[in-house]
Amino acid sequence: MTEIYDFDKSAWDIKGSIAPIQPTTYSDGRLVPQVRVIDPGLGDRKDECFMYMFLLGVVEDSDPLGPPIGRAFGSLPLGVGRSTAKPEELLKEATELDIVVRRTAGLNEKLVFYNNTPLTLLTPWRKVLTTGSVFNANQVCNAVNLIPLDTPQRFRVVYMSITRLSDNGYYTVPRRMLEFRSVNAVAFNLLVTLRIDKAIGPGKIIDNAEQLPEATFMVHIGNFRRKKSEVYSADYCKMKIEKMGLVFALGGIGGTSLHIRSTGKMSKTLHAQLGFKKTLCYPLMDINEDLNRLLWRSRCKIVRIQAVLQPSVPQEFRIYDDVIINDDQGLFKVL
């Protein structure tokens, strides 16, 4: 039995939206580089210099003899760094990077990035830029099938997204608890509805916001579980959720991310499941990569958040991450 509880819009009305990156071009048709700064926090961190950087650009042929042929639109997550430089200065250096892209494969298709340009202002992000990085291709590219293997490719930076980490404490991504299941427990999930306004160019505005498309995604927060072999009622779980005082915001971690902060009282069991942290971050890059790619340059706004209370999936139910399932004859074996 599923129970749904609606949060009041005051829980996200301050920082529940992200402005779009409106594409503008030079006279020759090239995109003008732009930077977008997002601050999903409450501003109670003493040091305001920590930020997460995310690059967007074009994967194109690296041919010095002719005009480059664009193959796909891609992204490069650089991670967290500490810098006092202006966003425009960071963008300028990023556009001058010589980033090589190579398509390869492991468990799934991958894209390899490495930079050949010396770093100055971007030194705090040298771990990704100088030692190279490998990403799941579908997470960082909108059309990896169009990237050739017989022609050298480069990643030309066009846009930069900076997320200021202004919240006091740590941004915890509780990965280990996301698949945790328990007998007689109630799973606490969130269903988030976004209204999306794709960046269609300057001066082009849809007058009626209701005409804009909406999309949903779901995240798992934790489980409410009693010590005895009894199950909490939905009304009791709703009361515990209300006491948590959850505040929501949208950030740019990995593209678009949902940030949650508990400003009230949290149950001891749930607090332990979340690593005793009250500031959480859920990147859509991990949750829903297709939706994340759609939101790379778009304006998006939270229009609804609902707490979804469901019975925890029984432990005897197996999670199948592989399309090959073992059979009794042993013809296929999942290693």
From Swiss-Prot:
Q: Which UniProt keywords apply?
A: Host cell membrane, Host membrane, Host-virus interaction, Lipid-binding, Membrane, Viral envelope protein, Viral matrix protein, Virion
- Decide whether keyword Translocase is in the record: no
The entry's cellular-component GO terms read:
host cell plasma membrane; membrane; viral envelope
Gene Ontology molecular function terms on file: lipid binding; structural constituent of virion
**Coiled-coil parts of chain:** none
Which Pfam families does UniProt cross-reference here?
A: Matrix_Paramyxo_C, Matrix_Paramyxo_N
Alphabetized InterPro entries for the sequence:
Matrix_C (IPR042539), Matrix_N (IPR042540), Matrix_Paramyxo_C (IPR055413), Matrix_Paramyxo_N (IPR000982)
Name where it mostly resides.
Answer: virion
Q: Which GO terms describe its biological process?
A: virion assembly
Q: From the Swiss-Prot or TrEMBL record, state where the protein is found.
A: Virion; Host cell membrane
Task: Identify its protein family.
Answer: Belongs to the morbillivirus/respirovirus/rubulavirus M protein family.
Q: How does it assemble?
A: Homodimer. Dimerization is critical for virion formation. Interacts with host ANP32B.
What is the protein's known function?
The M protein has a crucial role in virus assembly and interacts with the RNP complex as well as with the viral membrane. Associates with phosphatidylserine (PS) and phosphatidylinositol 4,5-bisphosphate (PIP2) at the plasma membrane. Interaction with PIP2 triggers matrix protein lattice polymerization. Matrix proteins induce host membrane deformation and curvature necessary for virion assembly/budding.
Protein's name in the database: Matrix protein
Species name: Measles virus (strain Ichinose-B95a) (MeV)
